[in-house]
């Protein structure tokens, strides 16, 4: 499984984030400032100044929420969560087809994530398009929902036709770089935990958990 979508934030958390972000109208700046040389040519959005105190505070809260999710930790095996920023797209804004930088000053980008702070029914357009080898997948998230996907995929955000798209984005450096290896480990972990919940502990399950832990040691970096 290369993609993960999950409800990360509850309504009260979403409202608190939006309230804080709406206070900082003077801190929104051209999104091209943090894009690579190629991506900056197709990036048209606004982002909260990453060096501002409110950006640092809210980024810390987002990081804590991600690390509190057992499902996300099993899927992404996060070593470093970094580059968190809040972006806003208004009418006629979009982010054209691009690839994320492999390395940033804060870490390697193995996985990218987007958390929607506005509900998908409050704006038109703005779909996230992710390109696999022979197909495209289109995502439009509920408020508080996160999507995590490989940073190696080309992706884009369609033009906003009406309304406002407010999201939090960031990157994950994983303990395991390989997409395939992460998928095998995720399946093994999910299967073992499912059997534990259904049947309780057993000697056979001990061996499965042992194999999972040792595979993580072998494949991790």
Swiss-Prot record:
Q: How is the cofactor bound?
A: Binds 1 Fe(2+) ion per subunit.
**The organism's lineage?**
Bacteria, Bacillati, Cyanobacteriota, Cyanophyceae, Synechococcales
- Entry's EC annotation: 1.14.11.-
| Provenance organism | Prochlorococcus marinus (strain MIT 9312)
Domain Fe2OG dioxygenase intervals:
80-174
Supply the name of the protein.
Answer: PKHD-type hydroxylase PMT9312_1262
Q: Which GO terms describe its molecular function?
A: 2-oxoglutarate-dependent dioxygenase activity; iron ion binding; L-ascorbic acid binding
Q: Which InterPro entries match?
A: Oxoglu/Fe-dep_dioxygenase_dom (IPR005123), PKHD_hydroxylase (IPR023550), Pro_4_hyd_alph (IPR006620), Pro_4_hyd_alph_FE2OG_OXY (IPR044862)
Q: Which domain of life is it from?
A: Bacteria
Residues bound to Fe cation are: 98, 100, 155
Enzymatic class: oxidoreductase
Q: Which Pfam families match?
A: 2OG-FeII_Oxy_3 (PF13640)
Q: Does the keyword Oxidoreductase apply?
A: yes
> So which cofactors does this thing need?
Fe(2+); L-ascorbate
* Residues holding 2-oxoglutarate: 165
Query: What keywords are assigned to this protein?
Result: Dioxygenase, Iron, Metal-binding, Oxidoreductase, Vitamin C
Tell me one GO biological process term: intracellular iron ion homeostasis
